[in-house]
From Swiss-Prot:
Function text: Found in functional membrane microdomains (FMM) that may be equivalent to eukaryotic membrane rafts. FMMs are highly dynamic and increase in number as cells age. Flotillins are thought to be important factors in membrane fluidity.
Quaternary context: Homooligomerizes.
Compartment(s): Cell membrane; Membrane raft
Topology of the protein relative to the lipid bilayer: Multi-pass membrane protein
Source species, domain of life: Bacteria
Lineage of producing organism: Bacteria, Thermotogati, Deinococcota, Deinococci, Thermales
Residues passing through the membrane, by range: 4-24, 26-46
Similarity comment: Belongs to the flotillin-like FloA family.
Keywords, comma-separated and alphabetical: Cell membrane, Membrane, Transmembrane, Transmembrane helix
GO cellular component entries: membrane raft; plasma membrane
Full protein name: Flotillin-like protein FloA
Amino acid sequence: MEGLGIVFLAAVVLLFVFLFFSFIPVGLWISAWAAGVRVPLLTLVAMRLRRVPPAKIIYPLIKATKAGLDVRLDRLEAHYLAGGNVDRVVDALIAADKAGIKLTFDRAAAIDLAGRDVLEAVRVSVNPKVIQTPMVAAVAKDGIQLLATARVTVRANIDRLVGGAGEETIIARVGEGIVTTIGSANSHKEVLENPDRISKTVLEKGLDAGTAFEILSVDIADVDVGKNIGAQLQIDQAEADKKIAQAKAEERRAMAVAAEQENRALVEAMRAKLVEAQAQVPLALAEALRKGHLGVMDYYRLKNIEADTDMRESISRAAKPEGEE
């Protein structure tokens, strides 16, 4: 029984020691003291109770202390609880301090909480970044299209990282400047001969205003000749004018056909009236003979004239060439 009691007691002691060292990061506390960072053991226990991993706070604090930065433990913990990346902020502060860039903890924390990569921003401040613009198409006044690409060298502006526009805005503004410069040129040859004209115009516009970057230089990487847009527009206009003229001609033809049909209908109507009038002639003659207004000799003289007229018409029709009506 005594042996079982000793075994049970040893198991309890081992369990207590295991729980003690798992809940209280003694190893981390020793590492901090060895690095010259004085952190009370109760502070580490309090972090556990606040569900803050002590390692995510202590290791960045050790790096900051070794780099000669004065960073307080409670501020690192507050930044972690706010959802920030403590390790990246400390790395950015160390990089800025070594590069001689003025960057406070509050500024770095604000940049990190704004969703920016503060460490990358410090690196871009030290080593400027080159942004390659996509192919930009623009048309000079002579109608020739030019295709240009540019390389924009930028440096991060730490003071404007919070609330400043990003790379997309820089690319869009540079593209706008390229289009404006090419569009204002009287000839595409002017741009081909002096591509630095685009760079000067873009830099003079102050395109980095309101952005998180400072434009150092704009270099035209390539300028190619595209389509003859002016000639293509003239061809399209001529084709459109041709179609309009054809439509108007078709309209006039349709109107002429309609007028011809109307005239034919009018002729037929006149012929009908003529036939109707001719049908009234015998009746009028009979009425004249009945009333004595026309004598018999006058009637026969009229018939002779009518026969003579019919004969002349027959002779004239016979004298016409074959095929002629």
